[in-house]
UniProtKB/Swiss-Prot annotation:
GO MF annotation: an example: ATP binding
Top-level taxon: Eukaryota
Amino-acid positions noted as binding ATP in the UniProt annotation, renumbered to this chain: K34, G35, G36, V37, G38, K39, T40, T41, E245, N272
Lineage of the species this protein comes from: Eukaryota, Fungi, Dikarya, Ascomycota, Pezizomycotina
HAMAP family: Asna1_Get3
Active site: D63
Protein name: ATPase GET3
Organism, as annotated: Ajellomyces capsulatus (strain NAm1 / WU24)
Amino acid sequence: MSSTAMVSGDDSLEPTLQSLLDQKTLRWVFVGGKGGVGKTTTSCSLAIQLAKVRKSVLLISTDPAHNLSDAFGQKFGKEARLVDGFDNLSAMEIDPNGSIQDLLATGGDQADDPMAGLGLGGMMQDLAFSIPGVDEAMSFAEVLKQVKSLSYEVIVFDTAPTGHTLRFLQFPTVLEKALAKLSQLSSQFGPMLNSILGARGGLPGGQNLDEILSKMESLRETIGEVNAQFKDADLTTFVCVCIAEFLSLYETERMIQELTSYQIDTHCIVVNQLLFPGKDSSCEQCKARRKMQKKYLNEIEDLYEDFNVVRMPMLVEEVRGKEKLEKFSNMLVNPYVPPEE
């Protein structure tokens, strides 16, 4: 974050993410943007800040390129585990190449998990893996599990690059519609299918079609609940991360338009890797790059005057490990003040 006070007018919004910390109803926070703009660093840092004001925080990576382990210098897997040095911040990395059946079963008792025990065995797994973008399916299954357990007060998602993220957020709507259609078809053809299945010895596990359909209806209700939560600005928000370059700005604009069309709240943008060369600097490349960045920063200000725009400086070291992440996270809530230009 940065020289916001210098660049913006007095009527602009705070150039920090403090509003997210103050929003006590917030349950889902998605952090996303183009690849290579600092999403993971930003999501880890935001989770650290949230852990200071909330009882329990879970950080989930839905990016197949999992970087949480690298960022914290600690190995994470598909089970949530505490981040070293914290007693209320946990992290996990969903493996899109793992078995979806394993993921759906991790909730323990199948009776508590509407997606587990549908009685479809390998067919359910085949169906899941036939969906374009299985990582979205895996991630969404984890969301469903968290909705049912409610064991964390707030969940932060370090998302995959833009396209995957938007498909993931669209997933509940698509799935809800598909299950509604399936339910409609089953009510029409259920009796006939039951008689056919009865003649063939029934379904695996001794379940009948009605039991499976009732579990699918329960699943549809849960998905509907998730959908409603994602579209509730009191519960869900999306933090856009970008750098001050044309392609990143273009991607951010497209993402915000799509989020708006999905009715998902977004009002914060983090602009990373900003240069602030001093006025006596002899680095001509730095000055030229700063000039270009200023141009795109001005565009961001014009386009998103009702957003909290956070300006983060380019650092001389990688942000890895708890101490550096904490230092970086402080700049998300206390604006970085650059040297005079």
